[in-house]
Amino acid sequence: MQTFQADLAIVGAGGAGLRAAIAAAQANPNAKIALISKVYPMRSHTVAAEGGSAAVAQDHDSFEYHFHDTVAGGDWLCEQDVVDYFVHHCPTEMTQLELWGCPWSRRPDGSVNVRRFGGMKIERTWFAADKTGFHMLHTLFQTSLQFPQIQRFDEHFVLDILVDDGHVRGLVAMNMMEGTLVQIRANAVVMATGGAGRVYRYNTNGGIVTGDGMGMALSHGVPLRDMEFVQYHPTGLPGSGILMTEGCRGEGGILVNKNGYRYLQDYGMSPETPLGEPKNKYMELGPRDKVSQAFWHEWRKGNTISTPRGDVVYLDLRHLGEKKLHERLPFICELAKAYVGVDPVKEPIPVRPTAHYTMGGIETDQNCETRIKGLFAVGECSSVGLHGANRLGSNSLAELVVFGRLAGEQATERAATAGNGNEAAIEAQAAGVEQRLKDLVNQDGGENWAKIRDEMGLAMEEGCGIYRTPELMQKTIDKLAELQERFKRVRITDTSSVFNTDLLYTIELGHGLNVAECMAHSAMARKESRGAHQRLDEGCTERDDVNFLKHTLAFRDADGTTRLEYSDVKITTLPPAKRVYGGEADAADKAEAANKKEKANG
């Protein structure tokens, strides 16, 4: 096994990983940085993000407003000190991206244009047409090329991290092009591996978003926090799950049922102004959890449209006009034509909620470090405490760069101060990783990874979807336990050493099953409804701050069982309150403004 010596290793070369690498290189120009990715960096899932990235940019906006929208959107499960750090650093990172070449969309006067996104009361989403993730990732990638100390290991699949006496010491990866193993030694490792959306059958995620980093951290005793909170995006294409960005609704797109009725006005998102008034375009911009839940209720009422790929509602953009659609949403027009045969200029787009984002992830502190010294996590694979029970659209792209920078700087500092590990123990661990790989390759049985993965996805849709019941969650838990046993009998039929996807998909499935069990067990134990976790059973349909204003921590014990613990939520300035949107929120804002004015005059 070849060994590469580095100071810092970063797993994942998407937005978070690249930003961490750049920050590390700037923090210590002499540091040797290994950047490992199972795909070429520009194929990372960040490229699929369409809508935009949040940052205060207007005079009538403020850090306080961004903070409030994020905490309320997360149903008060956010770490408020983390949110405060985030909102104050977003504008700096957006400006930095512009200086590096990110082509933010502009107003006629040359200023940066911003959209309104769901759950945000003010336009603060920076965007580059509807290809924001692509442009951000391209900008970060080309910037990273300026730093020769960043050595890329493209198309390398990380098998496991190496830990000695509570401190990370590197990792073992497989060169997918050759089938050989490489040991990368480093006194700090940053996990930037993305979420776990592929544990669901229908999702908006790329094929690489399989929960690898979460699974590796979990196997070393690091808990996964708040895994019951999985966001369904309201507007995915039926069948494929391809995302119709929230930017569509930010530009004024509307959602209608089979009767052409804008049904969101029936679910607490109706505007204060009558239908048809200009302000009414924001009715569709409620938080994603509530908009997805409204679809479920429309389906129960029989107001959705049946198709061979499932029930849908319509996303209508026709009133925006051809010019605006081709200027602001060109990629959406391409996708709709290619995947559902619809020209958005002429007809509405069929959409349905689709699993989209993992709010939970690897537990970290406010500096992105886990319980293992030197092991950091950032981006969707992590739970730094930003999103709570429901993420607001456009906060995730901003999270990648704000906390990517922080993780890179903190990891560089940790690597510089770490002492030497036990060489014999580290080598023994690396040999153990190699042996487990051989055992998997030689495993005999009649099971197929693809069938198990398919059954896992369907089980998660059924038991851990938009609305949940104890019966369906228990059914999912039982099914996952069965699949874990069957996984032990998976047979690798491909014996090649070059791009053995049969082997790689099997390894991904192993991580996915472990992560899915954390999701299901965490959901069953949270006997309330909060954010993206909604229950239908009696006594659990409302938020319960007395018993469940706390984080769920899921551990995987040595015998393979999932064990749950809980930790407190850090509340600094904004105590829990009712979440209100639409006209109710407008009325509350007016009352607050009047109260402030009265106090000022009194």
Please place each PLM-identified region on the residue numbering.
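A short alpha-helix-loop-beta-strand transition element characteristic
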Residues: 77-83, 94-110, 223-226, 304-308, ...
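Conserved N-terminal glycine-rich FAD pyrophosphate-binding loop of Rossmann-like flavoproteins
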Residues: 39-69, 75, 231, 245-246
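Conserved redox-cofactor binding core of oxidoreductases
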Residues: 93, 98-180, 185, 192, ...
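Core beta-strand elements of the Rossmann-like FAD/NAD(P) dinucleotide-binding domain
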Residues: 3-6, 178-188, 371-374
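An anion/pyrophosphate-binding glycine-rich loop and adjacent beta-alpha core
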Residues: 41, 216, 222-342, 410, ...
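Glycine-rich loop(s) and the adjacent beta-strand/alpha-helix scaffold that form part
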Residues: 188-242, 307, 387, 393-410
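Glycine- and aromatic-enriched mobile tails/lids
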Residues: 4-6, 15, 23, 29-35, ...
